[in-house]
Amino acid sequence: MTIIAGTVVKGKQLGRKLGFPTANVDAKIHGLRNGVYGVLATVNHQFHLGVMNIGVKPTVGSNLEKTLEIFLFDFHRDIYGEKIECSILFKIREERRFDSLESLTKQIKKDISCVAKRFELIGIMAPNKKESLLSHQELNLPDLCFYKKCNNLYGVNRGVYNVIDNWFFEYGITQVAYRRIYILSFLSFLKEDNPKVSSKYIRFGAGGLADKLNRFISSYVEESEENILG
């Protein structure tokens, strides 16, 4: 999976002025699509949920350099100069230009609310609270019990669950609770991709499961790098 690593640097602090302080990250972001994402960030070995923007900030200028900034939920510490790792879980929209800073501010509020809701639906954020549930007991259930949770929520059978779990393990996500976040995020993506299906069971359609995983990841990877499964 895509993990972005870099150092938090001081930016122009526009987010802070708008009421949404962000961590500007000096990192290699070549190959990633501009847009707004739900992410899992790691600072000092602690997990934090957040909203990430990759892009050129077209509302505040033109011909600007592509940057990466992250808003972390319920986080108020100064981390300039510290290392941060960020794993993309899902994308909510493309980057776009707004007519005014007021319009931009309204959209940022919507983005934060949208990402928080997605985290709630996945099961890793408490409703009405910006606290992480990464240590929540459901993410640390015995494997069979966690599979049954996925089956009840998304109608995935045991064989498909095992394939998905193994994929993320092979991508280097070896920590169990961390990997289960990806599993829930992917299953949520599959369900959204089939909104008109009346059955509670997931349907894969043409291309099967491998195609769905490619689409899940290619939502944030540039076209030249989309076919990650070869």
From Swiss-Prot:
<keyword id="KW-0288">FMN</keyword>
<keyword id="KW-0285">Flavoprotein</keyword>
<dbReference type="GO" id="GO:0009231">
    <property type="term" value="P:riboflavin biosynthetic process"/>
</dbReference>
<dbReference type="GO" id="GO:0005524">
    <property type="term" value="F:ATP binding"/>
</dbReference>
<keyword id="KW-0067">ATP-binding</keyword>
<dbReference type="InterPro" id="IPR023465">
    <property type="entry name" value="Riboflavin_kinase_dom_sf"/>
</dbReference>
<dbReference type="Pfam" id="PF01687">
    <property type="entry name" value="Flavokinase"/>
</dbReference>
<dbReference type="InterPro" id="IPR015865">
    <property type="entry name" value="Riboflavin_kinase_bac/euk"/>
</dbReference>
<comment type="function">
    <text>May be directly involved in the regulation of the rib genes. C-terminal part of RibR specifically binds to RFN of the rib leader of the riboflavin biosynthetic operon. The RFN element is a sequence within the rib-leader mRNA reported to serve as a receptor for an FMN-dependent riboswitch. Possibly, RibR produces the comodulator FMN through its own N-terminal flavokinase activity. FMN-activated RibR may stabilize the anti-anti terminator structure of RFN mRNA, causing transcription termination of the rib genes in trans.</text>
</comment>
<protein>
    <recommendedName>
        <fullName>RNA-binding riboflavin kinase RibR</fullName>
        <ecNumber>2.7.1.26</ecNumber>
    </recommendedName>
</protein>
<keyword id="KW-0808">Transferase</keyword>
<keyword id="KW-0547">Nucleotide-binding</keyword>
<dbReference type="GO" id="GO:0008531">
    <property type="term" value="F:riboflavin kinase activity"/>
</dbReference>
<dbReference type="InterPro" id="IPR023468">
    <property type="entry name" value="Riboflavin_kinase"/>
</dbReference>
<comment type="similarity">
    <text>Belongs to the RibR family.</text>
</comment>
<keyword id="KW-0686">Riboflavin biosynthesis</keyword>
